[in-house]
Amino acid sequence: MNSSKTTICALASSVGKGGIGIVRVSGPLCKVIAKKMLGFIPKPRYAYYGLFFDQESTEIDKGIALFFPKPYSFTGEDVLEFQGHGGMIGMRLLLESAISMGAKLAESGEFSKRSFLNGKMDLVQAEAISDMINANSKRASKSAFRSLSGDFSNQINGLTKSIIELRVFVEATIDFSDEEIDFLQFDQVKCKIKDIKQTIETILKSATQGIILREGLNVAIAGKPNAGKSSLLNALTQESSAIVTDIAGTTRDVLKETIHVNGVPLSIIDTAGLRNSHDKIEKEGIKRANFEIEHADVVLMVFDAQDDKPDLSILPKNINDQSLLLIKNKVDLTSGAIKREVINDIVQLSVSAKYSEGIKLLRKELSNISGLEDLSEGVVLARRRHIIALEASLVSIGNAIMQLEIGAIELMAEDLRFAGQFMGSITGEFSSDDLLDEIFSSFCIGK
């Protein structure tokens, strides 16, 4: 247990006015603070209703107090909670009283960090707390809860155990190569390591889906001026987010709105019309438009249905055709119908943004093109660092397979060691202080 010598305190409820406000205290001074602010030490895990006092024994509030002795608490340390009236001044008085008695104001995520360091949860579960707080859809919240409950950690720990067990067998073969011991045969080892590789690939696919669920996708709307880009944004968001006129070049800056498709957040980005311009302001808007288009996950190339075909030459050169979706807009001005077709391996949708016709088709296509339809209900939220670690582990396993093929058993054992370390970094078994600081600094103060 990594018990800290300092005692921390923070507001654990939302900042602002509310029916109830909570101040949380954790550390070795909890009992001292309880005696001064309550007049007694509460019985563990029992709720007590009474007066709260400041450092001068003046009554400052009345509410419920809870005490959780170490190690049976969230942080693994003594924890004291004051639940009072949710006014900003009242909460500040409680915090000031705790600080005057030796506590210090907690840093962002410090309660969760202490919980991790004291072995109450692993790094994935700690991150899941933040993900639950910041979840922007029901699906994301449920997935974060699965991570908090240990689903993702169990997958990683099981895989890490398999890698370690295989490495033990391989190293034993090295240590006792001159002995007549019946170790795993070549084909059995190869089968086991390929099973590990397949499992990593499966988890990596699920984690990649979890990234989409957690972070969403950026969808840039591109096209010439007056093609109906802003109308398309308004139709997708079902709001008048963008100004729509018949004057070309109305949109001069980037406008972003968020929608949800299949429980996944999509950031829809309306951009300035792409054309050659001598107007200084419009040129800056086009520059920003190109930046958003280049960095988008999906590009909606909007063109007028009265044109024969879209002018793809106006798009930045380094976008991926697979992320491109052609939107043939204003079909209400032609004899064309709302439909989906594939032209030169690129999906094209005929829509009328003005009358919101074909928008359901577009939302479904956004789900398809982004792979969101394949999201399983059991997916857990993941972070970029998880993907990096899984990919690195997969490379090491691939190297280990190659070393096995040529009989380089010692090098194979080393690659298995690397793979295990990469996997262990996900749950925090192997983590640097800098990584921990980066992760927990994004948390709320009271978590």
From Swiss-Prot:
Where does it localize?
Cytoplasm
Copy out the cofactor comment: Binds 1 potassium ion per subunit.
For binding K(+), which residues are annotated in this chain's numbering? N226, T245, I247, T250
Keyword tRNA processing attached: yes
Domain TrmE-type G residues, every copy? 216-371
Question: For GTP, which residues are the binding ones?
Answer: 226-231, 245-251, 270-273
Q: Does the keyword Hydrolase apply?
A: yes
Q: What class of enzyme is it?
A: hydrolase
GO molecular function list:
GTP binding; GTPase activity; metal ion binding
Cofactors per UniProt? K(+)
> Quick one: a GO cellular component term?
cytosol
EC number annotated for this UniProt entry: 3.6.-.-
Single Gene Ontology BP term? tRNA methylation
Q: Which residues bind Mg(2+)?
A: S230, T251
This protein's UniProt keywords: Cytoplasm, GTP-binding, Hydrolase, Magnesium, Metal-binding, Nucleotide-binding, Potassium, tRNA processing
State the family it belongs to.
Answer: Belongs to the TRAFAC class TrmE-Era-EngA-EngB-Septin-like GTPase superfamily. TrmE GTPase family.
Q: So what does this one do?
A: Exhibits a very high intrinsic GTPase hydrolysis rate. Involved in the addition of a carboxymethylaminomethyl (cmnm) group at the wobble position (U34) of certain tRNAs, forming tRNA-cmnm(5)s(2)U34.
Which NCBIfam families does the entry link to? Answer: mnmE_trmE_thdF, PRK05291.1-3, small_GTP
Q: How does it assemble?
A: Homodimer. Heterotetramer of two MnmE and two MnmG subunits.
The protein's name in its UniProt record: tRNA modification GTPase MnmE
Query: Which organism is the protein's source?
Result: Vesicomyosocius okutanii subsp. Calyptogena okutanii (strain HA)
